[in-house]
Amino acid sequence: MGGTFDPIHHGHLVAASEVADLFDLDEVVFVPTGQPWQKHDRRVTAPEDRYLMTVIATASNPRFSVSRVDIDRGGPTYTKDTLRDLHELNPDADLYFITGADALGSILSWQNWEEMFSIARFVGVSRPGYELDGKHISAALRELPADALSLVEVPALAISSSDCRKRAVEARPIWYLVPDGVVQYVTKRRLYLPEPTPELRTPE
């Protein structure tokens, strides 16, 4: 399951559990992005903090694990590299790449997207009521197997990382939106605090 996880929340965990059940997956590997190329216009929490929050959030589920492949690779994170690395580490595994359905809307702009479908099946998870306009995607993928791309609706995805960050900036509680250990980590590390306003000095 790929994502920025900034921070990871219960929606991510429920989605992973639901997909694991529906597709009978042995394991769900969470892969925090290193440097998300599509989010260069906003501040992203340090990779190590996002990795540790993901470890904390997934620790109690023996079916979940966390990979550092994107964080340790360096440079901008592209899904094609993520899948190549995971395939090299697990050459005999049937890979499913779980991501937000909204991200799949732009999949044809991803680097080497054709190659990615030869490595893994894609599962897009969405909040209730979200509709993916997939006509252009379907046209491009018509030569691929019918199960190359699946969509799964997950009610808990009404929670979003951006809302969690906004609440933290405003000193509002994020309890029960993210796992307890993540709340404690965010507090201890003082993540998502407002950026200090530069002090302006009047010339004397």
Swiss-Prot record:
Record keywords, A-Z: ATP-binding, NAD, Nucleotide-binding, Nucleotidyltransferase, Pyridine nucleotide biosynthesis, Transferase
The protein's Enzyme Commission number: 2.7.7.18
Catalytic activities: nicotinate beta-D-ribonucleotide + ATP + H(+) = deamido-NAD(+) + diphosphate
Pathway assignment: Cofactor biosynthesis; NAD(+) biosynthesis; deamido-NAD(+) from nicotinate D-ribonucleotide: step 1/1
Enzyme class, broadest EC rank: transferase
Record Gene3D superfamilies: HUPs (3.40.50.620)
Protein family (similarity comment): Belongs to the NadD family.
Described purpose of this protein according to its UniProt entry: Catalyzes the reversible adenylation of nicotinate mononucleotide (NaMN) to nicotinic acid adenine dinucleotide (NaAD).
Identification of the protein by name: Probable nicotinate-nucleotide adenylyltransferase
